[in-house]
Amino acid sequence: MLTNHSVGSTRPSRVMTESAMDAEFFGAPAWAWVQLCAAVFAISTAGVMFQQLPHVPPLLLASWRMQATALLLAFGAAREWRVADGDVRARWFKTWPRLGFSGVCLGAHFGAWVAGLQTTTLARSLLLVCTTPLFLAFGALALCLPTSAGELAGAALGFCGVAMVASDRHDGERETATWQGDVLSLGAAFYIVGYMIVGADVRRWMPLCLYAGPVTAVAALSTATLSYLVEDTEGSGGVLGWAFSGVSSYFLVTMYLALVPGLVGHTGYNAVLKHISPLVVSTSLTMEPLLGSALGYAVGLADAPGWRTGVGGIVIVASVVTVIVAKGRNPR
């Protein structure tokens, strides 16, 4: 039985914990940085999991991932809609064109990336899909948006790091690099820019699932439609094959992709965009090649990384720290 003294003693501890998580570090709450770290680790497993189903057409596989994630997000979106006030609901309806655009960008990102994963090495695909900070940084310059020199330098440093990882053993016993796969992966990095910019803006007032749910549903619909038109979907059970084909690996891999890289990873990124700049969030993705390549080697899908991967990984981490510190010193 808890005495009054013991109950009272637990309250300061709880308050101190909550205060610590709400404390700001480099211009954002501590919990946002913790969630960002969890998202990085979660999303780093996606490449390996996509490669568990190499015979499923890429657009179809991307659509499966989006379908499962959209179903999970629907529960949160319904709850947020019930408690939303009239102003939020009205603004949400007016934002639909932008949500649709964001969803198409997200679908294009995953479709191109899965195709890249299936046609080039894991390390190269992971590094090229993480060059988004360059598109954001130089896009900000072109549009005359406020971006600090430190953020730009960190983004460029991150590119140098992932370039070193990419230069390490292009071909090996298990993998072969192709320029087609490289171009697809680079295209995936470009397509996600629209998704991140829209999210950074509307997430300032829109609840998380009311944004991520519809956007993911649009991504699922767009990739499923394109897959049906240009791919042989029947061999994998059709557009809904992950749920109704009877192949357990289809269901298990798809649900993992939805729960871990999907909810913990990409939805986690959306959650912190309200507090952390898109350039910082996207630059954190530059850790994915190192983590994803190491995981691929550990499970026997990728070749052993060499010294360039080690040095490149150090450069990548340094670039992340550079951008975070620069953002904290130059809050916008």
Q: What function would you assign to each model-found segment?
A:
Residues 21, 66, 167, 235-240, ...:
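C-terminal-most transmembrane helix of multi-pass membrane proteins
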